[in-house]
Amino acid sequence: MALRLFEHNEKAYHAAVRMMEQYGKAAIVHPTGTGKSYIAFKLIEDNPEKVVIWLSPSEYIFKTQLESLKRNDPDFPLANVHFYTYAKLMCCTQAQLDDIAAQEPAYIILDEFHRAGAECWGESTVALLKLCPEAKLLGLTATNIRYLDNNRDMAEELFDSRVASDMTLGEAVVRGILPAPNYVTTVYQYQKDLARYQTRVDNLRSAGIQDVNQKYLDALRRALEQADGLDKVFAHHITNKSGKYIVFCANKEHMDEMISHVPEWFAGVNPEVVV
């Protein structure tokens, strides 16, 4: 059964094929959830006799991609596809890299190719690419910029800026490819901020200005005291008790502090939550 791509992926696929034919490399920058991996699977399907090396950050990512593929096409041809993680390449000796290159891949797929910009991973990836000069290169990522690495553009470094298709998250939402997110904002642990503002008001020299600012601060305090706490916000918006959720923290100390509040905050979602 031939793979059928969504329209946005089909256009990206054909653009990438044309670019690889012309330049030997092509990058696709599409948001997570738009089905980028199927573009690579389509390339494999259209070239069943060609050897393909697929590089990915982790075995888990590739496993979930394969599970999705097998649900759609249990008999998909993968005999000539050889999977390696970037970390695996990093641990390879020169002889082992030579053995990988000896498979003479027609295509090398760099999944999440921005990750190949990491110092150790990048060196081994570039070393393999140099050993396979005839292989065409297809890159997939949701972002080609390494923002915490001096804003390095990995599409420029690895693909000479040959980007066959570029789609922003906003575009994907507007086009109905991805669902619009539901943003919920709230405040918590505002007592320290209020105390800091109170100190600033107390230090104002003009009595008139101090009175005006004190009224604003008192109004803010009353509004915050009436606002729902995180426990009520979570209970209202988190409806899947067994769902998976990500919490972003500033550092280890911040994370430890947040963990200490989990039983309190998530009591209305799942009172049996384990920290």
Spans of features found by a protein language model:
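Inter-Walker segment of RecA-like/P-loop motor cores
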Residues: 62-104
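SF2 helicase catalytic motif II
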Residues: 86, 98-145
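Conserved pre-motif I regulatory segment
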Residues: 1-29
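Conserved RecA-like ASCE P-loop NTPase motor core of nucleic-acid helicases/translocases
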Residues: 51-58, 244-251, 274
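Hydrophobic residues on the short alpha-helix immediately C-terminal to a glycine-rich phosphate/catalytic loop
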Residues: 16, 39-47, 124, 128
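Conserved helicase motor "Helicase C" RecA-like lobe of SF1/SF2 P-loop NTPases
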Residues: 250-275
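Interdomain helical connector at the RecA1-RecA2 junction of SF1/SF2 helicase-like NTPases
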Residues: 149-245
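Walker A/P-loop
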Residues: 22-43, 248
